[in-house]
């Protein structure tokens, strides 16, 4: 009878455990679906992070010990426990795990590097930051935290060391007790780096000192103290140097991990933008915008000491993301600069770090018009190494500006441009007719990356009025939904023709919602298949909606404008054959 009770108790316990696992999985999936706006985003997140979660069956095959071992090793925590033991015994952690016979899939760490500046973070914010770290860990991220004390004077190591110890003890208390269920597990590390001489930067002594805690689910907090081999003393060093050095070492361990995010938590927030009234740039495509933003920071709209701090953050991000792109061969690593307060916000849709882990994009689109009152003002910048951009117009071209001349000068690859348009629109371009039509009316041609996207803007006429018309806005199908690419192209389009721009789209086009958010207005007639969109600086002036009203000389007569726009857009002939041939 006693045996039966024990079996019954064990059965109930297993049912409860199974329910906990099922509920945890369901809650995680629901939160992911709630926070991601498209199926593609949810799928991309799950493809990258799903093997970070152990939601396996409770039962383990007992047919053979080998099968038990294999089953265990497909679990993240089991693999990591084995790695830790082998590291400690100075063995290769991958021997006999990923051989041809078992073909087990490696489960890499998904690392996020944080640089946390210690100025005036109150206890309430620390508690919120702790919750954000917990959420990130639950989402499959392995955080590494650099403590930034660059604001301290460098003349007294002993004083600074005592101050840092005191601050770190406070932080550990804010983050919770590791032995208590649900609290973060943390460790404080120092003197991980050595400087051999002045010519060489800091080099990490033992990467295992960081990797082993990560494999154990522990968040390492790293103090900016290094060992100077020349002087044989410990000393403080700029935290940006250590961040770069560690990132360089981690990027060499592709078989163990991937560096997903570089996050700077700084009270000054993201990189300020003149266009956005000194609130932050939403998204920065460094390949295209870096030098312009550096110049913008020097025009005097912020104090020099603040400017230098922003420049240091921007330059460090540029160096690290360039390094990551070069070493990994992709643009997967994302930079985030935000404030301690914003990191402490515990809402997946508002916290830009959590939202970016789920979607790999900012919480708002960077191409939304900053003049629109509905566009939020942010203190967070998202950065990518990004894509190169080539923009051609009459102002930067020596010869007569025609499409034929651009192709003849090998600035544009005709075949690749046609292939991009065919792929993006899912139809065959009537190449000869289309190129003949736009050849002499070309206003601007934008090519992004390796023909990943393009925009063609032409000059169209209504009577004597010359108006910029967005003729083609194309993104290769493989890149559609790629974070930031459409925004990058559309921002270039608007900056090329800020005065006045129109375009048309079929009424049934699902992209129209995106267009509505970026235009000043739109129109369509019941008998037309097109919806016409318009935007530009001219609409920041007063609009004469009633002809009888007396208005200033610069006011826009919207009735006349709509007639012109309709005449142009309805008169553009089809560019593609009716069906794919």
From Swiss-Prot:
It catalyses: L-glutamate + acetyl-CoA = N-acetyl-L-glutamate + CoA + H(+). Its main location: mitochondrion. It is an enzyme of class 2 (transferase). Its EC number is 2.3.1.1. It is found in: Mitochondrion. One of its GO terms (molecular function) is L-glutamate N-acetyltransferase activity. GO terms for cellular component: mitochondrial matrix. Keywords: Acyltransferase, Amino-acid biosynthesis, Mitochondrion, Transferase, Transit peptide. Residues 401-558 form the N-acetyltransferase domain. It comes from the Eukaryota. Pathway: Amino-acid biosynthesis; L-arginine biosynthesis; N(2)-acetyl-L-ornithine from L-glutamate: step 1/4. Belongs to the acetyltransferase family. This is Amino-acid acetyltransferase, mitochondrial. It comes from Scheffersomyces stipitis (strain ATCC 58785 / CBS 6054 / NBRC 10063 / NRRL Y-11545).
């Amino acid at each position: 009878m006693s045996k039966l009770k024990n079996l019954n108790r064990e059965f109930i316990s297993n049912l409860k455990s199974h329910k906990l696992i099922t509920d945890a999985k369901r809650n995680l999936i629901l939160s992911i679906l709630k926070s991601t706006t498209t199926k593609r985003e949810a799928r991309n997140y799950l493809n990258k992070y799903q093997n970070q979660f152990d939601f396996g069956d409770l039962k383990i095959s007992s047919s053979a010990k080998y099968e038990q071992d294999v089953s265990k090793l497909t679990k993240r925590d089991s693999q990591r426990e084995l790695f830790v033991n082998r590291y400690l015994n100075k063995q290769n952690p991958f021997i006999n795990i990923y051989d041809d016979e078992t073909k087990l899939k490696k489960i890499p760490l998904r690392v996020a590097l944080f640089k946390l500046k210690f100025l005036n973070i109150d206890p309430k914010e620390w508690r919120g930051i702790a919750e954000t770290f917990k959420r990130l860990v639950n989402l499959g991220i392995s955080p590494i935290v650099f403590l930034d004390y660059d604001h301290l004077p460098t003349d007294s190591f002993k004083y600074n060391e005592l101050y840092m110890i005191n601050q770190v003890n406070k932080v550990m208390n804010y983050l919770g007790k590791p032995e208590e269920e649900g609290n973060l597990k943390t460790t404080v590390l120092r003197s991980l780096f050595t400087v051999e001489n002045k010519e060489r930067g800091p080099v990490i002594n033992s990467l295992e000192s960081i990797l082993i805690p990560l494999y154990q689910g522990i968040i390492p907090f790293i103090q900016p103290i290094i060992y100077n081999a020349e002087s044989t003393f410990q000393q403080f060093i700029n935290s940006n140097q250590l961040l770069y050095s560690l990132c360089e070492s981690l990027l060499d361990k592709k078989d163990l991990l991937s560096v997903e995010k570089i996050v700077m938590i700084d009270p000054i927030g993201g990189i300020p933008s003149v266009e956005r009234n000194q609130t932050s740039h939403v998204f920065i495509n460094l390949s295209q915008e870096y030098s312009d933003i550096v110049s913008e920071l020097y025009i005097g709209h912020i104090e020099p000491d603040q400017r230098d701090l922003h420049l240091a953050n921007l330059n460090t991000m540029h160096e690290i993301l360039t390094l990551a792109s070069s070493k990994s061969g992709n643009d997967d690593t994302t930079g985030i600069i935000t404030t301690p307060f914003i990191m402490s916000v515990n809402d997946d849709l508002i916290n830009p770090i959590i939202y970016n882990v789920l979607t790999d994009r900012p919480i708002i689109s960077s191409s939304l018009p900053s003049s629109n009152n509905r566009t939020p003002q942010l203190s967070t910048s998202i950065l990518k190494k990004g894509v190169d951009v080539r923009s051609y117009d009459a102002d930067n071209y020596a010869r007569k500006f025609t499409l034929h001349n651009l192709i003849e000068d090998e600035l544009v690859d005709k075949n690749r441009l046609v292939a991009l348009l065919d792929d993006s629109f899912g139809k065959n371009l009537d190449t000869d007719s289309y190129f003949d039509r736009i050849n002499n009316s070309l206003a601007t041609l934008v090519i992004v990356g390796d023909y990943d996207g393009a925009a063609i803007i032409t000059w169209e006429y209504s009577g004597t009025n010359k108006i910029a018309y967005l003729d083609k806005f194309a993104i290769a199908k493989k890149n559609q939904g790629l974070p930031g690419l459409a925004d990058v192209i559309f921002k270039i389009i608007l900056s090329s023709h800020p005065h006045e721009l129109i375009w048309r789209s079929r009424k049934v086009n699902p992209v129209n919602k995106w267009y509505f958010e970026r235009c000043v207005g739109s129109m369509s007639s019941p008998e037309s298949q097109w919806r016409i969109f318009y935007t530009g600086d001219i609409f920041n002036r007063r609009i004469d909606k009633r002809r009888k009203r007396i208005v200033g000389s610069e006011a826009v007569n919207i009735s006349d404008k709509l007639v012109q726009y309709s005449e142009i857009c309805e008169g553009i002939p089809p560019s593609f054959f009716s069906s794919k041939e």
